[in-house]
């Protein structure tokens, strides 16, 4: 069971690193640093390869029908259960940027 938890944690970490590096690449492009942007994109691709390997090892890639159902379930859960309290809490704390970010994710 610890290995499955480790795979889940590794998958989450690799996935987050991928998205972060792509955001860094975009910023480097905006600052006219194409070489650095390319480096970040290469690192992001490597993180994707790692994340996919972890997902496969967890048995997380199934038939397309199963994958579609999983995606629908996940998006519905975010929309109905995750983001509404996040929006409310950000609003209560006066954090407009977080409130907007959470609301746009719904």
Regions found by a protein language model. Give the residues of each.
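Non-heme di-metal
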Residues: 1-106
